[in-house]
Amino acid sequence: AKMNVQGSKRMEALSKELDFSYKRNGSLVLCFEDADRSKLEELLEKAEKNGVEGCQIISGDEVRQMEPQVSDQVVAALYAPAGGIVCPFGLTIALAENACANGVEFFLNQEVQNIVKKDGYYEVCTQDHVYETKLVVNAAGVYADVFHNMVSEQKIQIIPRKGEYWIKK
């Protein structure tokens, strides 16, 4: 959560530097029942503890003033004005272009079959080659557990879940 706060503060400048779309539009966590207001209070407390600035709990009427299409059943919300959105594709391409410009080599169409932790480095074994590196970034999404478990004694399992993002223009 703390890294999320730091990243949010840096995102606007990064979007200008690397030329990708970014908009600080705030975020809302909606509450549909009075009995759940305490959960909003808990989220607010966590946000404040983690340094998220400007968060507040607002009424259902205030939510509908901000977002007229929100259900009449919403009784309250946690509003975080620092929330923002990016185009994930544009961000990814911008980061890859920047990495390439700074000397990163991409090895495409390589299936990682094993990762071996050595003294001070890793061997990343693919079907064609063994790469040696000091750092491995695990960006395998729902398959991240597979790569984690290759090098860690503490095994994990990721159980994929499906969710939705609604984009409003």
Locations of regions flagged by a protein language model:
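Helical element adjacent to the flavin cofactor pocket in flavoenzyme catalytic cores
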Residues: 78-135, 139, 143-146
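Dinucleotide-binding Rossmann-like beta1-alpha1 core, especially the glycine-rich loop
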Residues: 1-66
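Short amphipathic alpha-helical/adjacent loop interface patches that line ligand
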Residues: 4-8, 99, 141-144, 163
